[in-house]
UniProtKB/Swiss-Prot annotation:
InterPro entries: Ribosomal_uL22, Ribosomal_uL22_CS, Ribosomal_uL22_euk/arc, Ribosomal_uL22_sf
BP GO terms, sorted: cytoplasmic translation
Protein family according to the UniProt entry: Belongs to the universal ribosomal protein uL22 family.
Lineage: Archaea, Methanobacteriati, Methanobacteriota, Methanomada group, Methanococci
Assembly: Part of the 50S ribosomal subunit.
A Pfam family reported for this protein in Swiss-Prot or TrEMBL: Ribosomal_L22
Name of the protein: Large ribosomal subunit protein uL22
Length: 153
């Protein structure tokens, strides 16, 4: 695999980073979750994702919400979903970044998400046998997620 660089250059003494590579989750769901939790305090973002996993909090789909139905509750947008699989994977990346910050000696109660983004990963190419000796592609898209945390005062 090639080396992936972070999109944002930061001071390594003041920030903690983590990256999830080749995650088998939906890129559209990941984009919507990253947009929603960007800039949040870390504890608040972890609680938000836990509520999404428990089907108590809706993630508004602002970019990829053309045919997405309304959900009950106040969340500030008309279209929304509960992307549980993507929330679980992003939650594990956030907790990894939190542990990296703790290892660096940063105060984990005063961390906020400075940068979070999702990029297209590689495609796992497979095929499905069909009738008369043919085969149809059955590809699996993957996603890379980057998180940078910083202390706020």
């Amino acid at each position: 695999m090639s080396k992936l660089n972070y999109k944002v250059e930061t001071d390594p003494n003041k920030t903690a980073r983590a990256m999830g590579r080749s995650l088998r989750i939906s890129r559209k769901h990941t984009i919507e979750i990253c947009r929603e939790i960007s800039g949040m305090k870390l504890d608040k973002a972890i609680a938000y994702l836990n509520r999404v996993i428990e089907l108590k909090q809706v993630v508004p789909f602002k970019r990829h919400g053309k045919d997405v139905p309304h959900k009950k509750g106040k969340y500030g947008w008309t279209a929304g979903r509960f992307p549980q699989k993507a929330s679980t994977q992003i939650l594990s990346v956030l907790e990894n970044a939190k542990k990296n910050a703790e290892y660096k000696g940063m105060n984990t109660e005063k961390l906020r998400i400075k940068h979070i983004s999702s990029n297209k990963g590689f495609t796992i190419k497979r095929h499905m046998p069909r009738a008369f000796g043919r085969a149809s592609p059955k590809n699996q898209e993957t996603v890379h997620v980057q998180v940078i945390l910083e202390e706020f005062y």
